[in-house]
Amino acid sequence: MTVDTIFAPATARGRAGVAIVRLSGPRAATALTLLAGRLPEARRATRAALRSPPSGPGPTGPGPEEGGEVLDDALVLWFPAPASFTGEDVAELHIHGGRAVLAAVLGALGDLPGLRPAEAGEFSRRAFLNGRLDLTAAEALADLVDAETQAQRRQALRQADGALVRLYEGWRKTGIGLLAHLEAVLDFPDEDLPPEVETAVRGGIGALADALAGHLDDRHRGERLRDGLQVAVVGAPNVGKSSLVNRLARREAAIVSDIAGTTRDIVEVALDLGGYPLVVADTAGLRETSDGIEAEGVRRARARLAAADLTLAVSDGTVENGADDPAADLTGEAVLRVVTKRDLLDPRAVERWLARGALPVSTLTGEGLDALEAALESRARAFFEGDGTPALTRQRHRSALMEARAALRRAAEAPLAELVAEDLRLALRAIGRITGRVTVDDVLDVIFRDFCIGK
């Protein structure tokens, strides 16, 4: 099968000090020689004047004096296969990051025969197909590029380092061992194997199912770390929810008005507290209303409250015994009680609220905001810190493990050894899909389509 040589910027487009253009494929060496005048020593950065290729290169490629227009003064690197990111011949051009320079170099590469621009994620896809990455490592690479907080960075690096694949491959090898023992019973019925073999296999299958169940019972911790802990800010109308969100965001994200019912849709802001990502949602005030649009906002607020990982239940601090305060009805470990208008409270009122477990804040002066942020960070840390095992990071992994767990539980209860073996095979197949041991093109398309072009 003919493999194209692909090229793309590996850095973000736009004005920058340096841009990197990556090439991968069988004509990478030829392209590098044509532009740089020679093939540099492998894995050693070499300075070269990049020139547009001549219309008719000689059999050994042009020398520097034979090339066309100078495009840039660059550093070039050459990574011969298989010791490269993709497992193919790879070249990198480190050029000045101006738009015109990048456009000129990409244009010159596009004029060369056998080269084409890469599709999104195509470099990583080739790395997977050539055995340089498993699927979890490829996904971790995408997560690392997207990481905005330190906790996200640490999780992505841990997954890229193979923490998940080691866990899943360990389970898969355990399952293969169990299947081998079971198939020995099925394939050699006359060998008088002890009956304890099948009993031990069933016990091992049950233990494996329990291990998967424990891994799945994680409150979606890994996915939340990728996407942000969902925090809903709820309460009655006009208690200062939008002002509180604006204070947390350090910007005017939500409209603030003295008119009750101003907020009618969800307004989200992303926060980084102590390296943990939070998505804080300002919601419509909870009340009965005949206004159709406001009623829809209240419905959405209740839906966001039901789906939230953490709730900020906000009340007006100047009203200590509000009979119709919806925030007062919200309790539990996933609720932080917040009262606003601290600047209007005397010290004794502040102490009374604190004694009731509430956090008094002033959105006008910022007083109490540090304590609220510290409480949010503490809740986020408690949510994200696990038992030390790698976290599930994608719904694709979760779905496959749920499928494997169901198959293992069927296997543990199956009346016939043949049925046990079949369900065990299904479980192993599901686990193998996570790392790419078992895969189909449709799965690869979904995984790699959201990558950067140069990844």
From Swiss-Prot:
Cofactor: record remark: Binds 1 potassium ion per subunit.
Subcellular localization, as worded in the UniProt entry: Cytoplasm
One CC-aspect GO term: cytoplasm
GO MF term (any one): GTP binding
Residues engaged in binding Mg(2+): S242, T263
Cofactor(s) listed in the protein's UniProt record: K(+)
Region Disordered, residue ranges: 43-67
Keywords: Cytoplasm, GTP-binding, Hydrolase, Magnesium, Metal-binding, Nucleotide-binding, Potassium, tRNA processing
Annotated ranges, domain TrmE-type G: 228-381
One of the protein's GO biological processes: tRNA wobble uridine modification
Keyword Ribonucleoprotein: no
Binding-site positions, K(+): N238, S257, I259, T262
Annotated positions binding (6S)-5-formyl-5,6,7,8-tetrahydrofolate: R22, E92, R132, K455
Subunit and partners: Homodimer. Heterotetramer of two MnmE and two MnmG subunits.
Task performed by this protein: Exhibits a very high intrinsic GTPase hydrolysis rate. Involved in the addition of a carboxymethylaminomethyl (cmnm) group at the wobble position (U34) of certain tRNAs, forming tRNA-cmnm(5)s(2)U34.
Family statement: Belongs to the TRAFAC class TrmE-Era-EngA-EngB-Septin-like GTPase superfamily. TrmE GTPase family.
Protein name: tRNA modification GTPase MnmE
